[in-house]
């Protein structure tokens, strides 16, 4: 599956003790690199992206993948990641920048930065002021993936499919347990969604809001059949679950798979009317990168519109590259759940870093919820 298994909240205090230490590392000198080490989310790239880069540049690429921001962050904070390109989520990158784990981009070597949408770049600047460290890989939203036929069968034609109530109203979820209810194993996504259902700030720094969200989650806990951030799209496509808290592109892939397989049911993704989280995954160069020159070449290559579009066509996540959209398959380019319209974008909230206090609280409550509430 195209899993960009995103955010398991990590205590922000871990980053706090690291701030300033990483700045002692020296950036690599740019000098005729012949290799590049890339660390990205699993199944988050087109099949020919790496081979074509190698043919174009003669640079050998070692391409590894991870399945959570925690995994990446652990490597970065250790001080010797061994990678030249990493792809953190923007709210994680914000604290990592403070910790000094990245080197500034040499924008003179990345002319394709001119292709980036200034509106989206201004949103990323909330985490990366001046866009000095990160270049967008892809972006997406948190929402609900569901099996249309299964939901109608159990909830009727008037099911609130445009609302978080579909997932957080215990009366609804009790009727859906029999066909499978999946939640991302990602506390910040789950708590943010619950907060939006309640009409509260999904980036709240008020502990009381998280305790209130926990009470909402406790009421539906008996009906959640799995916590899964890796296989839920496959489960939706295979009719093993009928509803999921998920990420837009993953559900898009599930929808395509059911269509390609000629299934009798249809998968749909919705950005709820109450709002949802908006997030960006960005390419960044670690402070200790051994091949910074090759890293700049890679970033410039990825921001070529045709290269960029090929990635979107594979993973169902849009990018901030404006010219690339002309090369995206029409069915994807005009899908409002991929390139969301302005009225939907206006109700999205950019995911922001949790404070150390909230991160600890959220983790504790999440473990309690998973163990039975």
Regions found by a protein language model. Give the residues of each.
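Ligand-binding "clamshell"
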Residues: 97-105, 122-124, 128-131, 223, ...
């Amino acid at each position: 599956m195209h899993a960009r298994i995103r955010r398991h909240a990590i205590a922000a205090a871990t980053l706090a003790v690291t701030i300033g230490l990483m700045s002692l590392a020296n950036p690599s000198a740019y000098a005729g690199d012949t290799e590049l080490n890339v660390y990205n989310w699993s199944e988050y790239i087109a099949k020919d992206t790496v081979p074509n880069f190698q043919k174009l540049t003669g640079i050998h690429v070692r391409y590894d993948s991870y399945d959570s921001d925690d995994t990446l962050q652990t490597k970065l904070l250790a001080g010797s990641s061994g990678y030249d390109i990493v792809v953190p989520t923007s709210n994680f990158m914000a604290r990592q920048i403070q910790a000094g784990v990245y080197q500034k981009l040499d924008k003179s070597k990345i002319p394709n930065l001119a292709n980036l949408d200034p509106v989206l770049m201004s949103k990323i600047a909330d985490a990366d002021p001046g866009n000095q460290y990160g270049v967008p890989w892809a972006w997406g939203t948190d929402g609900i993936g569901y099996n249309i036929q299964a939901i109608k069968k159990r909830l009727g034609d008037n099911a609130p499919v445009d609302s978080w109530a579909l997932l957080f109203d215990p009366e609804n979820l009790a009727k859906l347990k029999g066909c499978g209810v999946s939640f991302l194993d990602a506390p910040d996504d789950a708590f943010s969604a619950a907060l939006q259902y309640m009409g509260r700030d999904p980036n709240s720094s008020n502990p009381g809001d998280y305790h209130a969200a926990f009470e909402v989650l406790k009421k539906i806990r008996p009906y959640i059949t799995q916590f899964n951030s890796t296989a839920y799209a496959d489960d939706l496509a295979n009719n093993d679950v009928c509803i999921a808290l998920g990420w837009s592109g993953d559900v898009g892939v599930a929808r395509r798979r059911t269509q390609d397989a000629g299934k009798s049911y249809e998968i749909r993704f919705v950005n709820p009317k109450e709002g949802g989280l908006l997030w960006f995954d960005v390419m960044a160069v670690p402070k200790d990168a051994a091949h910074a020159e090759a890293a700049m070449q890679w970033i410039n290559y990825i921001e070529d519109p045709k290269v960029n579009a090929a990635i979107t066509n594979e993973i169902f996540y849009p990018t901030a590259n404006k010219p690339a959209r002309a090369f995206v398959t029409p069915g994807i380019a005009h899908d409002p759940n991929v390139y969301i319209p302005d009225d939907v974008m206006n109700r999205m909230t950019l995911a922001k870093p949790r404070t150390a206090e909230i991160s600890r609280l959220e983790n504790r409550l999440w473990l309690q919820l998973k163990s039975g509430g």
